Curated annotation (Swiss-Prot):
Identified in the spliceosome C complex. Heterodimer with U2AF2. Interacts (via RS domain) with PHF5A (via N-terminus). Interacts with ZRANB2. Interacts with SDE2. Interacts with SF3B1. GO terms for molecular function: RNA binding; zinc ion binding. The keyword Acetylation applies. The modification N-acetylalanine is found at residue 2. Residues 65-82 form the RRM domain. This is Splicing factor U2AF 35 kDa subunit. Belongs to the splicing factor SR family. One of its GO terms (biological process) is mRNA splicing, via spliceosome. A zinc finger (C3H1-type) spans 12-40. Plays a critical role in both constitutive and enhancer-dependent splicing by mediating protein-protein interactions and protein-RNA interactions required for accurate 3'-splice site selection. Recruits U2 snRNP to the branch point. Directly mediates interactions between U2AF2 and proteins bound to the enhancers and thus may function as a bridge between U2AF2 and the enhancer complex to recruit it to the adjacent intron. The modification N6-methyllysine is found at residue 39. Coiled coil: none annotated.
Length: 82
């Protein structure tokens, strides 16, 4: 039984682990996926979380309220970043 489970791990036949997430590190079903998304302990891919900060999410005044940032300013910020 253990050999069988090992042979189907990460394949379409595996009903517990998500084969999409196992192969490419992303799942087309997202949070709605019924299978497990096991994150590897090591990877050749570097993940840089929160690298780009959208000015619409971060622009605040001194009193803590959000500033309005135009779509043109957001696009310029994005273009300059990338």
């Amino acid at each position: 039984m253990a050999e069988y489970l090992a042979s189907i791990f990460g394949t379409e036949k595996d009903k517990v682990n998500c084969s999409f997430y196992f192969k490419i590190g992303a799942c087309r079903h997202g949070d709605r996926c019924s299978r497990l998304h096991n994150k590897p302990t090591f990877s050749q891919t570097i993940v840089l979380l929160n690298l780009y900060r959208n000015p619409q999410n971060t622009a605040q005044t001194a009193d803590g309220s959000h500033c309005h940032v135009s779509d043109v300013e957001v696009q310029e910020h994005y273009d300059n970043f990338f």
